[in-house]
Regions:
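N-terminal Rossmann-like FAD-binding beta1-loop-alpha1 element of flavoenzymes
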Residues: 5-30
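Residue-level detector of alpha-helix initiation sites
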Residues: 11-12, 264, 496
């Protein structure tokens, strides 16, 4: 065997077992399809979409990825560190509704109690601390919260950022000198295009860094394309380099394989192995049945002042709870996110998809000057306040993989409405928040046109598809994250989460991966 354990993916669900299983004495190999991203790469990403976006088919070699499906648009990160490269480092625990959700409440586990210590461990490892700043955008969000009758819930977000002394590099402040040197946050607002200062506690600064020191091997440019069980036990993983498909890789073998390729990557790989390659034909028929968007919506308000500059600070610095099931944060955008202006349209209400789309298009046609003024606004990224709205309510889409009339040449992942009828493209609380914010600043409120015209949810926090369940009829993995029917094959990323978290899920994914790793047997125990 090449390794004791192969981990596919280096995001939150993969980096935790990379460290913890290395601590238990296992030989660990981590496969990552993207590159190891340097500070120079991050600075370049703020200036060039080619350096920001991951679209290897056309030579875009960045670390930010967008997936567009009929019912949902998904954004995420690719590279060593996965989603942590482009996340806003918000580290929140979910509310009671998540732990009591019927999707996993009857599995014989008190999830709130059992995960409690793992949340603490995850918070320590990711360096959680309250955001110390309060600027103009935070004032505006506070006013929005008060206008919605939720002012008492407003506050700073707990965050995985080393604030320290701005711009000053100091010895590791987190792991007793065992971690890398760190530089204090300069409040540049570029968290979402990568922290070139090294202040954000991305996974390459903690779990992956420490795992490598213990002997774990991280292999960038390795996309897993098949998993095959071996006679006598163990698995073989075949890989390719997405940026150079002519590059030949020898298949890697390990006694155990952990799949943590992000929801889209994990589903695509497991569907391919089950239905196309037939190497894992016994994977549950429930694969892809219940995928969650965290019931998310993206809205915004544009300041009327062309000289406004809201970019100073972390990407997200404050939040509030509009009601028991709705959580709202603000977002600052870096220069590299200026392309997002083309996704914004007028704010329109309504649950009837066709009528809402017509209303949006009519508003654009009837008010062309307002539309053009917003689209071509000077200093747009400095003036825009984006709100991420998340809910813990039950909603879902389903994913399948196959040939489609629009592209019959090869099987592709595609979405369909879930058992609940789909995820919301319209969230009333989101539109209310955007409208209240715009009224407060004298600006214009906006919807994302993928939601208002396309009737698709937009999320940075996709969940589910390989849900934890009591058996293969209901889900893909058991309470120890092992795939039903395949001993030694596990799924530990967000795709194992069966319910909407309702807040930014990074801390929850990390805590679940910590629980998995703790329950993983010591080397030689079996």
């Amino acid at each position: 065997m090449d390794y004791d354990v192969i981990i596919i993916g280096s995001g939150f669900g993969g980096s935790v077992p990379a460290l913890r299983l290395s601590e238990k004495g296992y030989r660990v190999g981590v496969l990552e399809q993207g590159r190891k991203v340097s500070p120079d790469d991050m600075r370049a990403a703020d200036r060039s979409l080619r350096e920001l976006f991951w679209i290897p088919q056309i030579g875009f070699r960045g670390f930010f990825v967008q997936h567009f499906f009929r019912h949902v648009g998904i954004v995420g990160g690719v590279g060593v560190g996965g989603g942590s490269l482009v996340y806003a480092a918000v580290l929140l625990k979910p509310g009671e509704a998540f732990f009591r959700d019927r999707a996993w409440a009857d599995l014989g586990v008190d999830w709130k109690e059992e995960l409690s210590t793992h949340f603490d461990t995850a918070a320590t490892m990711l360096g959680r601390t309250p955001n110390p700043d309060h600027g103009k955008m935070d004032d505006w969000l506070q006013a929005t919260a008060e206008a919605m009758g939720a002012g008492d819930t407003f506050g700073p977000v707990p965050q995985g950022i080393y604030f320290g002394n701005a711009g000053k590099t100091e010895p590791d402040p987190f792991f007793g000198g065992q971690g890398p040197d760190r530089t204090g946050c300069t409040r540049c607002g570029a968290c979402l295009t990568g922290c070139s200062d090294g202040s954000k506690n991305s996974l390459d600064k903690n779990y992956l860094y420490l795992a490598e020191k213990l002997g774990a091997e991280i292999l960038p440019g390795r996309k897993a394309v098949s998993i095959r069980p071996l006679e006598g036990g163990g698995y073989e993983v075949q890989t390719l380099n997405p940026l150079n498909r002519r590059e030949k890789h020898q298949a890697l073998r390990a006694q155990r394989v952990i799949v943590s390729a992000g929801v889209v990557g994990t589903l695509d790989l497991l569907f391919k192995c089950r239905d196309e390659l037939r190497t894992l034909p016994e994977i549950s028929p429930a694969l892809g049945d219940i995928v969650r968007t965290n019931s998310e919506a993206i809205v915004a308000a544009l300041s009327p002042n062309p000289d406004e500059d809201l970019t100073r600070g972390a990407a997200i610095s404050s939040h509030f709870h509009a009601n028991a099931h709705t959580h709202i944060t603000q977002n600052r955008f870096p220069p590299g996110y200026d392309f997002m202006r083309w996704y914004m349209g007028p704010l329109t209400d309504g649950t009837a998809a066709f009528r809402r789309a017509l209303s949006t298009i009519a508003s654009i046609i009837l008010h062309p000057i307002l539309t053009l003024r917003a689209l071509f606004a000077r200093n747009w990224h400095k003036r825009i306040t984006v709100l991420t709205v998340m809910q813990s309510l039950d909603s879902q889409v389903a994913f399948r993989r196959g040939r489609r009339p629009i592209w019959p040449f090869k099987p592709l992942l595609h979405s369909s409405p879930g058992a609940s009828g789909g995820t919301p493209a319209y969230i009333p609380e989101a539109n209310e928040a955007a409208r209240k914010l715009a009224e407060h600043i004298g600006g214009t409120p906006h919807n994302n046109v993928l939601e208002s015209i396309g009737n698709a949810s937009v999320t940075a926090h996709i969940l589910g598809g390989c849900a934890i369940a009591a058996g293969r009829e209901a889900g893909v993995v058991d309470i120890d994250h092992q795939v039903f029917g395949y001993p030694g094959l596990f799924v530990t990323d967000a795709s194992a989460i069966p319910a909407n978290v309702g807040v930014n899920p990074a801390l929850t994914i990390t805590a679940l991966a910590e629980r998995f790793s703790e329950r993983f047997p010591p080397k030689g125990a079996d």
